[in-house]
Regions:
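Positively charged n-region of N-terminal signal peptides that target proteins for export
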Residues: 1-4, 687
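Hydrolase catalytic cores
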Residues: 209-212, 217, 230-241, 246-260, ...
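Subtilisin-like serine protease catalytic core
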Residues: 21, 128-241, 256-257, 289-293, ...
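C-terminal outer-membrane/trafficking sorting elements
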Residues: 616-687
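C-terminal subdomain of the subtilisin-like protease fold in secreted/lumenal serine endopeptidases
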Residues: 39-43, 255-276, 285, 289-300, ...
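Autoinhibitory N-terminal propeptides
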Residues: 4-6, 11, 17-132, 140, ...
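Active-site core segment of subtilase-fold serine proteases
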Residues: 148-206, 222, 347-427, 517-518, ...
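Catalytic-core segments of hydrolase enzymes
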Residues: 164, 259-354, 360-361, 398-513, ...
Length: 687
């Protein structure tokens, strides 16, 4: 019956002309979002600045453009920079011959108790079965997020002092401070206390930071309760995330401390082989770093058939009711493709939009005034970009159109040689019963931002499936404990690499709530704990998602960094491969649901301690040191870390300072490991 209707509709469409539409050819330098900004008077006019990637024709152009347009260039990767451009200068910058490309990228989405027990982080904090306890002391945890409550007791130490050392609020509207040309930096306890919070509309960052480094004053402590925090309140742009990573790495270097960074935001749009601008820039910042680790959420799209994969595919593109969606069609290197977008009335067959877009060269176009009832607001911006690393083409679409219930979009993709990957940002793909059409898949729903080679990409499992609010309301979820969280995004990457790298508890996770946020930001049934400190009541609540799983991993990595401050991402992957938890329901690992399994903090620590025995540490640098028997103080020069071991290899003391008191140790012979800027050295010291 459906086939007969389809044939009738096709015949009708032949007899009805397509309604007129307005078509504008735009600069080929622009991606779809940049084209939107430049070609529309409605979008983001209130913003004084625009965050973008700028690719230059040569090095000399940078200083010239800075002076001419007051551009702030920040992080560099090859000939491309993250940049802050005055909104009034955007058109002129885009037209400047010294600018090879100007891409705005996509807006980031938020990737939104029992956890410590399930991954055995509680055993590290208590020191169970180990020579010492591990709480993250001496380690930094950097969180790039939004909705931070700097006053929450979850971020205080045992004496009540705030463990947040530094904050960069990228959204602060006061006069910019810091090196990046936007936002404000709070770099003292007084400034952080005075600011109190970054905004009153979100609480995500307070929850995420609490998972990674909550103080443990309640049952709902974080993974690394004695780690210090450095926060970046993000503007949710790709460039803001890259600049934030750069900021945190520089802060760690300036303070001579190891750092674990967490990013629980991302976007589905972009090249998913790790070669996209954002993934590539983050990789360039992290590559070769010791003691600088990063976790990133894979996203919560695992329940949505938002991906089309194939050489020749047709499907109905189910755009959300709000009418706004983005589509990114990625070819493999050396291939080409065409994409036909069709908007029609299912009943009458009337066609409102029909155009075929092709790769082979870079271009950017805008279409307006199509459709039926919403013609005046209808907008479709499309651009074809070429990856300057792999040479692969992609076509990006930004659609804004409130379609009628009888209208639908369809997409037809044809490639020359290899499979094409198409991703819908907010919608999904469905065959709708049409002959020759296919449903979308939830494969390759991993966020573009989690496809890099350096960060650890984290999926989510279920920590618990029932909880009771402080008002007595019980919530029961239809999830299997320790099973994959149904929304946790799946791999593989478009180049075949497995993602996620690892999974961690991320569903029904309890953590702290931004006390400055409006009550509507959290449902009352999800608030499970409260505590009054200094006359003010603070709350803890339940949230779900890979946003919660990623900081679990960041916190565990902080514990591992406490044991080995020079730990690398490659070493972390080895630990995960050897020690992650496995059960038969996960299937053969690694796979694109669970990665290498669920992180096991204790097993990873034991493996780390076993593989960094004193006998394996080379003597590559001579550190200057002296021991004062009267004061029992060990003093060193040019060292980053000091570790003191018993003669049988048990770790007894450690510090990231150049001086260490041994007054708490009994008389005897000890081994002291000194890590300097040029290498490591082991000395014997008799007290």
């Amino acid at each position: 019956m459906r086939k007969i209707f389809l044939l009738t509709a096709c015949c009708l469409s032949l007899s009805l002309p397509m309604r007129a539409q307005h078509h504008i050819v735009l600069s080929s330098k622009l991606d779809a979002r940049a084209a939107q900004l430049l070609s529309s008077s409605r979008l983001e006019q209130s913003a004084n600045i625009v965050h973008a990637y700028i690719t230059l024709t040569d090095d000399a152009a940078k200083a010239q453009l800075e002076q001419q347009y007051s551009i702030r260039f920040n992080v560099r990767c090859g000939d491309t920079y993250t940049a802050v451009i005055p909104r009034s200068a955007l058109s002129a910058v885009a037209a400047d011959v010294r600018v090879k490309a100007l891409y705005v990228g996509e807006q980031m989405k938020l990737m939104t108790d029992e956890v410590r027990k399930q991954i055995h982080a509680d055993a590290l904090q208590s020191g169970s079965g180990l020579s010492t306890s591990y709480t993250g002391k001496g380690v930094l945890i950097g969180v790039i997020d939004m909705g931070f409550d700097f006053t929450h007791p979850n971020f205080a130490d045992a004496t009540g002092h705030c463990r947040i050392l530094n904050v960069w609020d990228q959204n602060a509207v006061v006069a910019p401070s810091g090196a990046y040309g936007y936002g404000s930096v709070y770099n003292s306890p007084a400034a952080i206390k005075a600011a109190a919070h970054d905004n009153t509309s979100a609480t995500h960052g307070t929850h995420v930071a609490g998972i990674a480094a909550g103080s443990g004053i309640t049952l709902y402590g974080g993974m690394a309760p004695e780690a210090d925090l450095v926060l970046v309140s993000t503007n949710r742009t790709e460039q803001g995330i890259v600049d934030g990573v750069d900021y945190l790495l520089k802060y760690a270097k300036q303070t001579n401390r190891p750092i674990a960074i967490n990013v629980s935001l991302g976007t589905m749009m972009g090249f998913k082989d790790g070669s996209g601008l954002m993934a590539r820039m983050v990789d360039s910042l992290l590559t070769g770093q010791q003691g600088c680790l990063m976790s990133v959420a894979v996203g919560n799209e695992g329940n949505r058939n938002s991906t089309l994969i194939g050489r020749s595919v047709k499907s109905v593109w189910k755009v959300p009711a709000a009418g706004a969606d983005q589509l990114f069609v990625e070819t493999r290197p050396g291939d080409s493709c065409s994409v036909r977008l069709l908007l029609k009335d299912k009943n009458s067959g009337e066609v409102f939009f029909d155009h075929t877009f092709s790769t082979g060269k870079i271009w950017s176009e805008r279409y307006d005034s199509f459709g039926s009832a919403d013609k005046t607001r209808a907008s479709l911006v499309a651009s074809c970009i070429k990856n300057d690393v792999t040479g692969a083409y992609a076509i990006s679409f930004h659609v804004g159109y409130s379609q009628q219930s009888s209208e639908e979009w369809s997409v037809e993709i044809e490639s020359t040689n290899q499979r094409v990957f198409a991703y819908s940002n907010n919608g999904y793909f469905s065959a709708e019963g049409y002959e020759g059409y296919v449903d979308g898949t939830n494969s390759s729903t991993v966020a573009m931002t989690a496809t890099g080679n350096e960060p650890i990409a984290v999926g989510a499992t279920v920590s618990k499936n029932r909880y009771v609010s402080i008002s007595g309301v019980e919530t029961i979820k239809p999830w299997a404990i320790s099973g994959r969280y149904p929304l946790s995004a799946l791999g593989p990457c478009s180049d075949g690499r497995i993602k996620p790298d690892v999974v961690a508890p991320g569903a029904s996770v309890v953590s702290s709530y931004n006390s400055f946020a409006a009550a509507r930001t959290v449902k009352g049934a999800d608030v499970v704990y409260r505590k009054t400190v200094g006359g003010k009541t603070f709350y803890w609540y339940v949230e779900n998602g890979t946003s919660m799983a990623a900081p679990t991993v960041a916190g565990v990595m902080a514990l591992w960094l406490q044991a080995k401050p020079t730990l690398t991402a490659a070493e972390v992957r080895t630990l995960l491969a050897k020690t992650s938890y496995y059960n038969s329901s996960m299937g053969q690992l690694p796979n694109n649901q669970y990665g290498m399994g669920q992180i096991n903090a204790l097993a990873g620590m034991r493996e780390l301690l076993n593989t960094t025995s004193l006998s394996e540490i080379p003597t590559t640098a001579s550190a200057l040191y002296a021991y004062d028997a009267v004061t029992e103080m060990l003093s060193t020069q040019a060292t980053r870390y000091i570790f003191v071991y018993s003669i049988d290899g048990q770790l007894l003391l450690q510090t990231s300072h150049q001086n260490l008191s041994l007054s708490g140790l009994p008389a005897g012979l000890y081994l002291v490991r000194l890590i300097g800027l040029q290498g490591e050295e082991i000395i014997k010291l008799r007290k």
